Amino acid sequence: MGSKSQQQVQVTPSASAAILVVMYIAAFVAAFNENIINVALHDIMAAFLVSAITAQWLVSGYMIVTSIFTAIMAFLSGRFSTRKLLFFACGCMVAGEVLCLIAPSFSVLLPSRILQAAGSGILFPLMMNVVLSCAPREKLGLYLSLGGACITLGP
């Protein structure tokens, strides 16, 4: 009945702490990526000679794709292991960031940003799943709150 991602894995307290720190950092970076583009929109419009409406798709597209991937995480977590999802999400984010960095045109920048969003959409709920798996039951509220704080403080 339980999938790979739902099974309780026994790890040492130090390994749990390391896993949680990695997940918190990943969630912080994902949240930071979500909003960092806002301060650069004017420069992007000038560099790529696009209108404000077109440039705004960097923000809107990111939010839409993040929402979609967050919504389908229940399906994905039932099909793939937490490790595979984490590597896929981080891979999407890193690949998207590198492609955004070297994007020669807006038509390359937008899909690169969408790739980042796919990673973020997976990372947010994945972090909560990992916290539920790794955190001690008596301190679950604290660890879930820390995860939420990382997402909130990212921007």
Language-model features: locations:
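Transmembrane-helix bundle of Major Facilitator Superfamily
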Residues: G2-P155
